[in-house]
A protein has these predicted regions:
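N-terminal beta-strand motif that seeds the catalytic metal site of vicinal oxygen chelate
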Residues: 1-14, 44, 69-72, 125-146
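Conserved short beta-strand elements that form part of the metal-binding/catalytic scaffold
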Residues: 27-66, 109-110, 115-123
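Conserved active-site tyrosine of GNAT-family acetyltransferases
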Residues: 16-21, 114
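Vicinal oxygen chelate
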Residues: 2-11, 60-146
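Conserved acetyl-CoA-binding loop of GNAT-fold acetyltransferases
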Residues: 23-29, 94
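Short amphipathic alpha-helices in soluble, non-transmembrane regions
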Residues: 21-23, 85-90
């Protein structure tokens, strides 16, 4: 089993498309009215985010206070890619913090709708973040959208 797609509601579709392109390199696959699909180019398997614009509303609450996605977590292919993402988040004043585990390092930020975005990377350049690393329940990760 692997990540194929997620669907997320956004307030401003254009703003979100720009953010996910410039920060993570996701490219537009399709767009129709207030719906868009973006993908991670270069991936061996399709990885798609489908975004639906809900528009702005003062009653809409972002982050962990709404039903929907709490955090979007990516495993970067290299420490250089992680540094590029962290720099872009910082440039946008969206970087919340950096965090290191025993076998990984990560940058925690927020997208334009205040959803938590996390880019992580294994400290071993020959492997992804392991299942064992996920078994070490890091309170910061699970509380990131609080």
């Amino acid at each position: 089993m692997y990540f194929q797609s997620i669907v997320m509601n956004v307030a401003d579709l254009d703003r979100s498309l720009e953010f996910y392109d410039e920060v993570f390199g996701f490219k537009l696959l399709a767009r129709q009215d207030q719906l868009a699909a973006i993908h991670a180019p270069g991936s061996e398997r399709p990885q798609v985010i489908v975004m639906r614009s809900l528009g702005t509303s003062s009653s809409r609450v972002g982050g962990a206070g709404h039903v929907g996605m709490r955090a979007f977590v990516l495993d970067c292919g290299s420490l250089n890619e992680l540094e590029r993402i962290a720099t872009e988040l910082d440039h946008r004043h969206s970087l919340v913090t950096r965090r290191d585990g025993d076998t990984w390092t990560a940058a925690f930020g927020r997208d334009p709708d205040r959803t938590a975005v996390v880019a992580g990377c294994s400290l071993d350049p020959d492997q992804s973040i392991t299942l064992e690393a996920w078994a070490q329940l890091d309170e910061f990760l699970y509380g990131v959208a609080e």
